[in-house]
């Protein structure tokens, strides 16, 4: 695995997502980020509690907790956008550059490294399968960001992609993603 990581080049993006298999050490995300430190590789982390908190010292480009995971990290129940933003900023204080907080049917909040806060609702639709919607949101966010470095564009594309995934029985189509994007 480390040999593959060593082939990453400046400008590449690495997404670390999900739980860690029992066959790997619990600190594998930390070891990966430590190994890549100092290189110009954008790292995205979509993981829960300690897996996420323990990598913040390596300043990941983007982290994506949901609002429930965010509250769990700090032992609080987050009741509104103001509280979600407050605790999202605490993750930045710990080292995250950009924090994307998904809120299921309530949309998402993005707190950028520039200090901007973007809040976007979720498009209307019937949830058919939410498995993978968070992963789709990350992929959409990166697609939008890579277009021109615009965080607001990235947030809209992330929400459209995650929503299209949740509103589909199988994989979302580009047509459905763009239809939802236009609603935002």
What positions do the PLM features span?
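Conserved phosphate-binding/catalytic loop of the ribokinase/pfkB sugar-kinase fold
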Residues: 1-10
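Conserved phosphate-binding/catalytic region of the ribokinase-like
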Residues: 34-35, 53, 81-184
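Conserved beta-alpha-beta core of the PfkB/ribokinase-like small-molecule kinase fold
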Residues: 13-83
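Structural motif
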Residues: 12-13, 98
